[in-house]
Amino acid sequence: MEPAKPSGNNMGSNDERMQDYRPDPMMEESIQQILEDSLMCDTSFDDLILPGLESFGLIIPESSNNIESNNVEEGSNEDLKTLAEHKCKQGNDNDVIQSAMKLSGLYCDADITHTQPLSDNTHQDPIYSQETRIFSKTIQDPRIAAQTHRQCTSSASNLPSNESGSTQVRFASELPNQLLQPMYTSHNQNANLQNNFTSLPYQPYHDPYRDIESSYRESRNTNRGYDYNFRHHSYRPRGGNGKYNYYNPNSKYQQPYKRCFTRTYNRRGRGHRSYDCSDRSADLPYEHYTYPNYEQQNPDPRMNNYKDFTQLTNKFNFGANDYSMAFSTDSTHVQSDNYNHPTKAQTIPETTKTKKHKATKDNETSRGNQVLTSNDAISLSYRPSPIKLDIIKKIYDTDVIPLPKEALTANGSNRDVDIQKYKKAHIRCRSVQKKKERSSQTNKHDENHASSRSDLKERKSNEHEDKAVTKARDFSKLDPLLSPLPLTPEPAIDFADHTDKFYSTPEFNQIKQNLHRSKTSLQDTVPISKHTPRAPTKDNSYKKHHDSKDNYPKMKHSPGRTTSKKNTTNSNGHQNFKDVSVKNVSGKATSTSPKSKTHHYSSSSDEEGQYKSPVKTITPSPSPYCKLKNPSIMDKNSAKNHTASADKNLTDNSPIRSNLNPTAFNKSNNNKSITNSTSNSDECTDKKPNCNSTKNESKDPNRTCGKNSDKHLSKSCTMASKRAPSRASSRTSSRASSRASSRASSRASSRASSRASSRDSSRASSRAPSRASSRDSSRASSRDSSRDSNRASSKASSRASSRDSSRASSRDSSRASSKASRKASSRASSRASSRASSKASGKASSKASSRASSRAFSRNSSRASSRASSRASSRASSRASSRASSRDSSRALSRAFGRDSSRASSRASSRDSSRASSKASRKASSRASSRASSRASSRASSRELRQIYCDSNKRQTPPHDTSINTKFEISEIKFRCGEDLNFYKNTAARLQCFNHNDQFYNPRFRPHIRTNRKKSESTNDTDSESSMSRCKSHCRNSPDSLTIVRRKKHKSGSSSISSSIEENCRSNSHIVTGKEKFTPFYYQSSRTRSSSSSSSSSSASLSCSKSTLKTCRKTQNRDNKQIKSKSDSKHKTTNMSSDYESNRHADVFRNSPEAGEKFPLHNSSPFNTHEQSNHSENAIDEEQKKAPNITTSHLHQKQNVKLHNTKKCKKKRPRDDDSDSSIKNFCKKRISGAQKTESEVSEIDDLCYRDYVRLKERKVSEKFKIHRGRVATKDFQKLFRNTMRAFEYKQIPKKPCNDKNLKEAVYNICCNGLSNNAAIIMYFTRSKKVAQNIKIMQKELMIRPNITVSEAFKMNHAPPKYYDKDEIKRFIQLQKQGPQELWDKFENNTTHDLFTRHSDVKTMIIYAATPIDFVGAVKTCNKYAKDNPKEIVLRVCSIIDGDNPISIYNPISKDFKSKFSTLSKC
């Protein structure tokens, strides 16, 4: 149908045209209802009908037939009421409807022959005159039209329908004018979803019949005084001021219509913030990148060029509707506008999270019942409200997934581009299709819908593949899209294995074996916390760290294998951290049988809107720990082996262990730090805040071990995370474990009393814990933990604790454990106590062993004997371990012992030892806590979080291999549920994940963000050393290390893993803490880069174990020699990481896959991480006092300068230097604090780039004796030295332009009717005031047509040179010969040997296509130049053969010239 001419604002013609109008019955009824309610109820009519007119002063009485541009008549409310009542009384129902539509803006008076569509836009007529609509040759931006159409929140719009009654859908290309598009809405009332605009990114129109009145009221209540021009994104880009990433011209999130004015200067990018059309279609007219030139036709203040843009209403800013989304939606499911309004509360992550979660919970049922039918994908660049999640869900069920081809390539090992993520997305998509086939299941797993255990059973009854697929599908349904939107509710399904870590084939095999061993019934045995919060999704940045999610779903594996995958990811510690920890993160770790998939209650608010990976996926695979849980009476050797192997796997694959062991899994879930890994006690210790809450582990690992009883641990951990451990389960588990652990612990404690006590305690503790853990955890995990604990604890503790514990191992162990537990308890009584026990055990591996032994001993022996043994063992162990092995041995022992012994002893001695040891540990811990409490108290919250974080990092680190094993079948493992997956239309372009963002940034704009670094860097000794030093320094100095760690997560090929691990660690730490104060790491917000090696070293440090302790000692000596071997670097990393771990500066994590492989056992044990981190903090101080830290000695010997610089630089963000004179340096620029690899070390070894530059500058300054202040302008050698500093001018060294000369010059330029041969040059200095003025000037200029304004740019200056008379004479002679001779014979080979300098004086060039525009531009610029004569200077210059900057203006100039010539002759 061809629309007739719209009649513009002639509202009187509506009555005539209404003759042909057949109102929709439903619409008619709705409008009548509105009118009746408004007239009969207390609600005023104008409030209902005119929600937006009054705010704009655009109340349009019907009498105003011709509304001039600035003469909009304002009618009073009484007039409107009278008018409405009059109309109601006057006519029939049609009259009433007509009046209502006219007044409410539902009626669009565009002249359409057969039907009159209803338009939402109340202001459409006044804004756009009839002439504008009809004759506007410039195609209006459809988005503007769409925006105008959506002004009214009711959005009750009718499709034009033929006289025959059939609805007609108009595509954008068919519309007569872009401004008319709102009138041809894509709502097909008859066909619902069938007809949509496909060519333009329209947002679905809202259901016109749904909640009209409520929508009016909501719109009335919206805060119009708030500037909604800028949608709020959870990730504010750097310097984004709460707006989108305007500072990155390449950002796909950039909204071209947000702000009409450019960022005036200091942008190194192409184009303007809002005007960068380089990636936009050319069909948008230039004027729409500025304020439209509708001054005469637009009374609407939204289009008023002279009003402050900040006062624009949310209606104008397009923020009310996300029309960057191109998708069709079922009109029945379309939500009202209110969900699009970014409220101030939404800007606050916590508030928004809470609101959204509440809303989502409230809407769970309705959402679950909704049918996900949309076939389109959404690209979200804002945080959707809970209401909008329905649409997102639908989109997730879409069959079409816009994945780049390269994303589906078979090779998923590419770390630079997260192809695996895309593959996983693709797989997920396929699984989604499968899921669609089972649509009922899809609905069942709403994001907020918690599936019942019966549901889980039903799923389990399905094929394991289907189970995994279903879980992945359910989880991915929302998570990928929502992951960048941290405030949205979590996906319904929890995946236990959200670790980014990929296991090497041997590791995987081992894990697989363990899983098969534990295949018993993880599903039945593993309680999964319902409220498992998802691991924080750092918007896109966090996704970057969750590569392991791709690994999740090995959809083809049997449930056990699926679990193994999940566990594998968990074993990475990352996944466990996410999954298990996530559960705890919510703060409510409700243990539910694994059968019942853990349902995501919207607990993401706990994680600051970050998505915690659901633990659900854990359930399918029986955990070896589940199996071990029962065989608490394993042979000591077998248990030992199990603990060693499990420790190994769990340390590497702590998530596996935690997952495999239902208890461990619960623990990890409960503990949020996935401390479930091999040493459950360590888990508790790591999670000690949680474990202590169980209070079975009061100060000894025994309590932590209390966790080991699967139920007890899970509950205790859960409750620990909740601070409400289930004592009953802990008692039962402690009883069962206390029996076996009491035996082993009695042996261990008896041995711990002697030198062998350290070894034996490590063995016994590992045995007993291995028994307990074998009971709790799978045999494999118990083997691993026993191996690891036996190795590390027997070695480190045998050395350290054998020495000390041989002296008074029982005394020291009790003292150390009591001290550490006191410290920890003082830090966080329950958390701290668990940590303290873990720390005590952690401080001295002998402490840990002594703890375990003292725990078991206290159980077996008596409370008194447990006290004495704990004292002696803790003393000796604390002494020995506190020195050198404290960190490593505490890590290893805390892992092995903490896990095994803490499990077994926590069960067995949880009561007795928890009581006795709690008493002794409280006493001793009160002492030690007096020391550590100051540290702990200052760091208590941070430490707890950090410890948790470190633990999760540890676990994550060793197994953290970004490269997925082929054995896992990358194609199926590559599900990265949630945070890591973005379903954006242009996934690659919009993807802003940690490791994969770099390629989308122009490095010139983000010079500090480098593309993925080489793996070699991660393995560098330098990096490991620096990371060690960093860890050490942070460990000592900063309670904020966790935060720093987040910062440190950075992109690098190898660091991607580490970043994922770090991310997981964070999420784990967040989860464990259950606190929101640790905001998820946001990639964009992190400016510092940690070299991959540093991150790997930090992760390695987290993963340090007993064996690591030994190696640390060895390494200490080697480090002094600056060991370069990988093992040395690994050990260094381990040592550093112990320090670092305690420091919580896991942010240094340079989790190279190598590092993960190096410390598979050590890194993976999350428990040890906490113990070690807390212990290491204590131990660091002790070690520093007693013996120089390995890190310290090594760093001091080789990297004193480097370390200091690194420490300083780490916290500093490098500024982007535009100095062209420093191009060489620019290429070398690194994020501050990042250690250079040997290949990158330039002049001074191992200096971060910033320090290198500073040192260089210092040397140059010393050479020229330059100090702060001015330098004589005649001393060219000083001025043009090798420096990065710019010439700074507070006052511009130019004279203002003489007004008379300026006017004459402008007159002369414009006399011939051409201005393209002239330009305006603006010079201005650098200051905030000037910058603001220049921005305003730019706005004023860009409002005008035919104006071209350049970016403000700097200039690079070569040194000056005086020419002597001879050279000048030669030039004069050539000049006299004529231009040709001058050109041909001229030769000038003069050069200089100095350095160039740039100045901070900025320059801007303005062109105008016509003399009218030129004169106006000059006047505008001169106004600001006059106001700031010392900072802004104007120059007008002529251009030889000048032409317009772009050819678009050529016809304009020619047309003006021709008319000018013709008219000037008249």
Curated annotation (Swiss-Prot):
Region spans: Disordered: 1-21, 223-242, 339-370, 428-472, 517-965, 1005-1068, 1086-1179, 1191-1223
Native source species: Human herpesvirus 6A (strain GS) (HHV-6 variant A)
Keywords on record: Activator, DNA-binding, Host nucleus, Host-virus interaction, Repeat, Transcription, Transcription regulation
GO BP terms in the entry: regulation of DNA-templated transcription
Protein name: Immediate-early protein 2
Similarity-based family: Belongs to the herpesviridae IE2 family.
Biased composition (Basic and acidic residues): 443-472, 536-553, 696-713, 773-790, 801-814, 1116-1131
Gene Ontology molecular function, alphabetical: DNA binding
Localization annotation: Host nucleus
Region (Interaction with human UBE2I): 989-1037
Subunit structure: Interacts with human UBE2I in the nucleus. Although this interaction does not promote IE2 sumoylation, it represses transactivation activity.
